[in-house]
């Protein structure tokens, strides 16, 4: 492969998924390029969420293949997809509302000195991610006290703090007012 022929980040070939007698996906083939925003548009029940779940290892396809960065990939758990940097954000946010922004950003990625969490280094890492993507939030603020748009930012920052290579959003603007939805689209364009 030459430099001009780099592999797509994620390719799905002939992917099908059924639930009983209902075909959620039938022979779907798509390629997603790195550094791009791709949108799947369709009616309710068209299979968009199912496709996202297959990409993230939440569901396994009945037939077809996934290729990640030029190599065949089969995810039987979300953890396997996550190890490769595939992260999902659904319309139902998965935040810990009774914990701080910092706790939500750093869960599982805390900086440690021996068996102890280095709170200063953990805070510094979270601040770096917020600064890098120009999403300023008070790291001490309880997530449950934030407006929905800021909670969505925390969810995005958490994905970015996990070194995400590909982020799959499932209806990211469903819970947002129109002005908040426009702000979210600007954030996504700037990633």
Label the predicted regions.
Residues 2-191:
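Glycine-rich phosphate-binding loops of nucleotide-dependent enzymes
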């Amino acid at each position: 492969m030459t430099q001009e022929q780099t592999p797509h980040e994620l390719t799905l070939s002939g992917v099908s998924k059924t639930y009983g007698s209902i075909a959620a996906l039938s022979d779907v083939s798509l390629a997603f390029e790195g550094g791009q925003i791709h949108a799947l548009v369709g009616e309710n029940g068209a299979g968009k969420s199912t496709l996202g779940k297959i990409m993230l290892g939440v569901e396994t396809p009945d037939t077809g293949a996934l290729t990640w960065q030029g190599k065949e990939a089969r995810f039987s758990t979300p953890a396997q997809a996550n190890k490769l940097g595939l992260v999902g954000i659904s319309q139902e946010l998965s935040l810990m509302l009774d914990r701080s922004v910092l706790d939500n950003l750093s869960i599982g990625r805390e900086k440690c000195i021996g068996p102890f969490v280095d709170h200063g280094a953990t805070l510094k890492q979270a601040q770096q991610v917020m600064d890098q993507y120009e999403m300023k939030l008070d790291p001490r603020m309880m997530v449950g006290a934030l407006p929905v748009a800021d909670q969505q930012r925390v969810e995005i920052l958490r994905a970015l703090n996990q070194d995400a290579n590909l982020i799959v959003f499932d209806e990211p603007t469903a819970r947002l007012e129109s002005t908040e939805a426009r702000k979210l689209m600007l954030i996504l364009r700037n990633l």
